[in-house]
Protein backbone atom coordinates (compact mmCIF):
# COMPACT_ATOMS: atom_id res chain seq x y z
CA UNK A 1 0.00 0.00 0.00
CA UNK A 2 0.97 3.64 -0.27
CA UNK A 3 1.51 4.05 3.47
CA UNK A 4 4.12 1.28 3.71
CA UNK A 5 6.58 3.46 1.79
CA UNK A 6 6.56 6.00 4.59
CA UNK A 7 7.10 3.50 7.40
CA UNK A 8 9.87 1.35 6.04
CA UNK A 9 13.46 1.50 7.19
CA UNK A 10 16.20 1.78 4.58
CA UNK A 11 17.13 -1.61 3.18
CA UNK A 12 14.95 -3.63 5.55
CA UNK A 13 11.90 -4.43 3.47
CA UNK A 14 13.01 -4.24 -0.14
CA UNK A 15 11.69 -6.93 -2.47
CA UNK A 16 14.82 -6.73 -4.63
CA UNK A 17 16.33 -10.20 -5.27
CA UNK A 18 19.25 -11.06 -2.98
CA UNK A 19 20.95 -13.41 -5.47
CA UNK A 20 23.40 -12.11 -8.07
CA UNK A 21 22.05 -11.90 -11.63
CA UNK A 22 23.14 -14.31 -14.35
CA UNK A 23 23.81 -11.61 -16.94
CA UNK A 24 22.14 -8.20 -16.90
CA UNK A 25 19.08 -7.77 -14.69
CA UNK A 26 16.54 -4.96 -14.93
CA UNK A 27 14.29 -4.80 -11.87
CA UNK A 28 11.53 -2.19 -11.94
CA UNK A 29 10.55 -0.51 -8.68
CA UNK A 30 7.83 1.45 -10.50
CA UNK A 31 6.96 2.89 -13.89
CA UNK A 32 6.99 -0.36 -15.88
CA UNK A 33 3.25 -0.48 -16.63
CA UNK A 34 2.34 3.07 -15.71
CA UNK A 35 3.21 6.68 -16.43
CA UNK A 36 5.44 8.19 -13.75
CA UNK A 37 6.45 6.66 -10.41
CA UNK A 38 9.65 5.60 -12.20
CA UNK A 39 12.52 3.56 -10.79
CA UNK A 40 14.63 0.72 -12.19
CA UNK A 41 17.65 -1.15 -10.82
CA UNK A 42 20.16 -2.37 -13.40
CA UNK A 43 22.75 -4.88 -12.16
CA UNK A 44 25.16 -7.33 -13.79
CA UNK A 45 27.25 -10.24 -12.59
CA UNK A 46 30.20 -7.94 -11.77
CA UNK A 47 28.17 -6.68 -8.81
CA UNK A 48 27.80 -3.21 -10.30
CA UNK A 49 24.33 -1.90 -9.52
CA UNK A 50 22.75 1.42 -10.45
CA UNK A 51 19.31 2.92 -9.89
CA UNK A 52 17.81 4.85 -12.79
CA UNK A 53 15.41 7.54 -11.53
CA UNK A 54 13.37 7.33 -8.33
CA UNK A 55 10.14 9.25 -8.61
CA UNK A 56 6.67 9.40 -7.19
CA UNK A 57 3.33 9.89 -8.92
CA UNK A 58 1.84 13.18 -7.64
CA UNK A 59 -1.67 11.72 -7.41
CA UNK A 60 -3.99 12.10 -4.41
CA UNK A 61 -2.75 10.28 -2.41
CA UNK A 62 0.75 10.12 -3.96
CA UNK A 63 1.85 6.80 -5.43
CA UNK A 64 5.28 5.60 -4.34
CA UNK A 65 7.66 3.15 -6.01
CA UNK A 66 8.79 -0.03 -4.29
CA UNK A 67 11.64 0.32 -1.82
CA UNK A 68 15.09 0.51 -3.39
CA UNK A 69 17.81 -1.84 -2.18
CA UNK A 70 21.11 -0.24 -1.08
CA UNK A 71 22.66 1.50 -4.09
CA UNK A 72 25.91 3.46 -4.25
CA UNK A 73 24.92 5.26 -7.45
CA UNK A 74 21.68 6.57 -8.94
CA UNK A 75 21.38 8.39 -12.27
CA UNK A 76 18.49 10.83 -12.71
CA UNK A 77 17.30 11.41 -16.27
CA UNK A 78 15.56 14.74 -15.58
CA UNK A 79 14.01 16.87 -12.86
CA UNK A 80 10.31 16.03 -13.15
CA UNK A 81 8.89 14.79 -9.86
CA UNK A 82 7.75 11.42 -11.25
CA UNK A 83 11.45 10.74 -11.90
CA UNK A 84 13.23 12.37 -8.90
CA UNK A 85 10.52 12.73 -6.24
CA UNK A 86 11.78 9.88 -4.04
CA UNK A 87 15.51 10.53 -4.56
CA UNK A 88 16.00 12.34 -1.20
CA UNK A 89 15.08 9.08 0.54
CA UNK A 90 18.19 7.50 -1.02
CA UNK A 91 20.37 9.53 1.35
CA UNK A 92 19.63 6.78 3.90
CA UNK A 93 21.87 4.60 1.70
CA UNK A 94 24.49 7.33 1.16
CA UNK A 95 23.71 7.18 -2.56
CA UNK A 96 25.57 9.44 -5.01
CA UNK A 97 23.19 11.14 -7.47
CA UNK A 98 24.35 11.62 -11.07
CA UNK A 99 22.71 13.81 -13.72
CA UNK A 100 23.21 16.97 -15.73
CA UNK A 101 24.07 20.18 -13.91
CA UNK A 102 20.68 21.60 -14.88
CA UNK A 103 18.82 18.60 -13.44
CA UNK A 104 20.79 18.98 -10.21
CA UNK A 105 19.99 22.71 -10.04
CA UNK A 106 16.26 22.31 -10.72
CA UNK A 107 15.93 19.41 -8.26
CA UNK A 108 16.14 21.83 -5.32
CA UNK A 109 13.03 23.69 -6.52
CA UNK A 110 11.14 20.47 -7.28
CA UNK A 111 11.93 18.79 -3.95
CA UNK A 112 11.10 21.92 -1.94
CA UNK A 113 7.77 22.16 -3.76
CA UNK A 114 7.02 18.47 -3.16
CA UNK A 115 7.74 18.90 0.54
CA UNK A 116 5.50 21.96 0.73
CA UNK A 117 2.61 20.35 -1.18
CA UNK A 118 2.73 17.17 0.93
CA UNK A 119 2.54 19.34 4.04
CA UNK A 120 -0.40 21.37 2.70
CA UNK A 121 -2.32 18.33 1.48
CA UNK A 122 -1.51 16.30 4.58
CA UNK A 123 0.01 13.31 2.80
CA UNK A 124 2.99 11.61 4.46
CA UNK A 125 6.34 11.80 2.68
CA UNK A 126 9.11 9.22 3.02
CA UNK A 127 11.81 11.89 3.43
CA UNK A 128 12.22 15.10 5.41
CA UNK A 129 14.10 18.40 5.07
CA UNK A 130 17.35 16.88 6.33
CA UNK A 131 17.15 14.27 3.58
CA UNK A 132 16.49 17.03 1.04
CA UNK A 133 19.61 18.93 2.12
CA UNK A 134 21.69 15.73 2.07
CA UNK A 135 20.40 14.89 -1.41
CA UNK A 136 21.43 18.31 -2.73
CA UNK A 137 24.93 17.67 -1.38
CA UNK A 138 25.09 14.23 -3.00
CA UNK A 139 24.82 15.45 -6.62
CA UNK A 140 27.71 14.81 -9.02
CA UNK A 141 26.83 16.75 -12.21
CA UNK A 142 28.02 15.63 -15.65
CA UNK A 143 28.20 17.30 -19.06
CA UNK A 144 26.57 15.68 -22.07
CA UNK A 145 28.77 13.23 -24.02
CA UNK A 146 31.33 12.94 -21.20
CA UNK A 147 32.19 9.50 -19.83
CA UNK A 148 32.08 8.74 -16.10
CA UNK A 149 32.56 5.48 -14.22
CA UNK A 150 30.00 3.66 -12.10
CA UNK A 151 31.56 0.52 -10.64
CA UNK A 152 32.69 -1.63 -13.57
CA UNK A 153 30.62 0.38 -16.07
CA UNK A 154 31.22 3.47 -18.18
CA UNK A 155 28.31 5.86 -18.52
CA UNK A 156 27.55 9.04 -20.40
CA UNK A 157 24.55 11.29 -20.86
CA UNK A 158 23.00 12.34 -24.18
CA UNK A 159 20.42 15.08 -24.84
CA UNK A 160 16.89 13.70 -24.57
CA UNK A 161 14.83 16.71 -25.62
CA UNK A 162 11.75 16.77 -23.35
CA UNK A 163 12.87 19.53 -20.93
CA UNK A 164 16.12 21.47 -20.40
CA UNK A 165 18.75 19.21 -18.86
CA UNK A 166 16.91 15.97 -19.68
CA UNK A 167 19.25 13.09 -20.55
CA UNK A 168 19.30 9.65 -22.08
CA UNK A 169 21.77 7.36 -20.31
CA UNK A 170 24.28 5.22 -22.20
CA UNK A 171 25.72 2.42 -20.04
CA UNK A 172 28.63 0.31 -21.27
CA UNK A 173 28.82 -2.93 -19.30
CA UNK A 174 31.31 -5.75 -20.04
CA UNK A 175 28.45 -7.70 -21.69
CA UNK A 176 26.39 -5.10 -23.53
CA UNK A 177 25.71 -1.42 -24.12
CA UNK A 178 22.40 -0.26 -22.66
CA UNK A 179 20.56 2.94 -23.60
CA UNK A 180 17.94 4.20 -21.18
CA UNK A 181 15.86 6.81 -22.99
CA UNK A 182 14.15 8.54 -20.08
CA UNK A 183 11.40 10.83 -21.35
CA UNK A 184 12.37 11.87 -24.86
CA UNK A 185 11.37 14.25 -27.63
CA UNK A 186 12.76 13.72 -31.11
CA UNK A 187 11.90 17.28 -32.16
CA UNK A 188 13.97 20.36 -31.41
CA UNK A 189 12.33 22.91 -29.14
CA UNK A 190 13.38 26.44 -28.14
CA UNK A 191 14.47 25.03 -24.76
CA UNK A 192 16.11 21.68 -25.48
CA UNK A 193 17.89 19.95 -28.39
CA UNK A 194 16.13 16.85 -29.70
CA UNK A 195 17.08 13.28 -28.86
CA UNK A 196 19.07 11.50 -31.57
CA UNK A 197 19.75 7.75 -31.89
CA UNK A 198 22.58 6.17 -29.89
CA UNK A 199 23.93 2.77 -30.92
CA UNK A 200 23.21 0.12 -28.28
CA UNK A 201 22.52 -3.57 -27.67
CA UNK A 202 19.65 -3.09 -25.21
CA UNK A 203 17.21 -0.18 -25.62
CA UNK A 204 14.91 0.79 -22.74
CA UNK A 205 12.42 3.18 -24.33
CA UNK A 206 9.55 5.10 -22.79
CA UNK A 207 6.23 4.90 -24.63
CA UNK A 208 4.02 7.60 -23.10
CA UNK A 209 3.01 9.03 -26.49
CA UNK A 210 3.93 5.99 -28.57
CA UNK A 211 0.43 5.66 -29.99
CA UNK A 212 -0.32 9.32 -30.49
CA UNK A 213 0.43 11.91 -33.19
CA UNK A 214 1.34 15.30 -31.79
CA UNK A 215 -0.06 18.45 -33.42
CA UNK A 216 2.37 20.56 -35.45
CA UNK A 217 4.48 22.72 -33.10
CA UNK A 218 4.31 25.86 -35.27
CA UNK A 219 0.51 25.64 -35.41
CA UNK A 220 0.32 25.08 -31.65
CA UNK A 221 2.56 28.10 -31.01
CA UNK A 222 0.34 30.27 -33.22
CA UNK A 223 -2.77 29.02 -31.41
CA UNK A 224 -1.15 29.74 -28.04
CA UNK A 225 -0.16 33.30 -29.04
CA UNK A 226 -3.64 34.03 -30.41
CA UNK A 227 -5.18 32.87 -27.11
CA UNK A 228 -2.87 35.10 -25.07
CA UNK A 229 -3.37 38.15 -27.28
Where are these regions (language model features)?
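Extreme N-terminal basic, low-complexity initiation segments
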Residues: 2-5
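His/Asp/Glu-rich metal-coordinating catalytic cores
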Residues: 7-11, 16-34, 39-75, 80-84, ...
